[in-house]
């Protein structure tokens, strides 16, 4: 039977009620996203609450986390309640397309649905979590642009082959790429994921790569440096 939780250095995430379990994508985004000077953070499609918890560990901002799946929201609330940062994270059952806030957000993060063109997997929950039928790139970019502070940053992790589609969507709403990191599972491999950061105004775009493993269970120095504050054995 799969373990119902995943333990990090400062918090534990239960994921037995969530369609999408704790995985590398969420950890990468939670560790990579720029939170310098952040005061208000929005986590779109929070799932287990993992990324919100990582944001809370990294900075002192107030965080609002939203998801459209009721089971995920309840589980995320439980994970937040058991963490050291329950007073700074609010988890809400919300469709981001209808979400409103009196405050614009310095940082917006999302590990959005993907596999647009693949066959749907069994189960409505997992389809919501993994397919862009429920939140396509255009709606996500539009919602982020509507809620982002003029000086803020919007960060996502998506499949590498979806990058151009996401860039087109972001550009339609005045968002410009400020940082791009291709993720390679091993040296020389084609990137499977890409981390993207957007701002309304950009002087230059930083483009780099990150390799996770040098060989089986031998992690790169860059990956260790990025995630060592979270993973127990890093």
UniProtKB/Swiss-Prot annotation:
InterPro entries: DNA_methylase_N6_adenine_CS, SAM-dependent_MTases_sf, Small_mtfrase_dom, tRNA_Adenine-N(6)_MTase, tRNA_adenine-N6_MeTrfase. Its main location: cytoplasm. It catalyses: adenosine(37) in tRNA1(Val) + S-adenosyl-L-methionine = N(6)-methyladenosine(37) in tRNA1(Val) + S-adenosyl-L-homocysteine + H(+). PROSITE patterns: N6_MTASE. One of its GO terms (cellular component) is cytoplasm. Its EC number is 2.1.1.223. GO terms for molecular function: nucleic acid binding; tRNA (adenine-N6)-methyltransferase activity. It comes from the Bacteria. SUPFAM superfamilies: S-adenosyl-L-methionine-dependent methyltransferases. Belongs to the methyltransferase superfamily. tRNA (adenine-N(6)-)-methyltransferase family. Specifically methylates the adenine in position 37 of tRNA(1)(Val) (anticodon cmo5UAC). This is tRNA1(Val) (adenine(37)-N6)-methyltransferase. It comes from Phocaeicola vulgatus (strain ATCC 8482 / DSM 1447 / JCM 5826 / CCUG 4940 / NBRC 14291 / NCTC 11154) (Bacteroides vulgatus).
């Amino acid at each position: 039977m799969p373990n119902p939780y995943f333990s990090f250095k400062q918090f534990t995430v239960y994921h037995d009620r969530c369609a999408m379990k704790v995985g590398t994508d969420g950890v990468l985004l939670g560790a990579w996203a720029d939170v310098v000077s952040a005061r208000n953070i929005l986590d779109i499609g929070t799932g287990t609450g993992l990324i919100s918890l990582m944001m809370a560990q990294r900075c002192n901002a107030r965080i609002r986390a939203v998801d459209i799946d009721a089971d995920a929201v309840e589980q995320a609330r439980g994970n937040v309640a058991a963490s050291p940062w329950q007073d700074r994270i609010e988890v809400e059952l919300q469709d981001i397309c209808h979400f409103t806030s009196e405050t614009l957000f310095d940082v917006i993060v999302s590990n959005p649905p993907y596999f647009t063109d693949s066959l749907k997997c069994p189960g409505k929950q997992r389809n919501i979590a993994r397919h862009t039928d429920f939140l396509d790139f255009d709606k996500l970019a539009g919602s982020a642009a509507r809620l982002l502070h003029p000086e803020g940053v919007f960060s996502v992790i998506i499949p590498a082959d979806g990058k151009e589609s996401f860039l087109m969507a972001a550009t339609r709403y005045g968002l410009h790429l400020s940082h791009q990191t291709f993720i390679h599972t091993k040296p020389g491999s084609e990137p499977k994921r890409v981390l993207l950061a957007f701002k309304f105004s950009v002087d230059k775009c930083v483009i780099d790569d990150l390799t996770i493993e040098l060989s089986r269970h031998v992690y790169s120095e860059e990956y260790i440096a990025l995630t060592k504050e979270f993973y127990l054995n890093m």
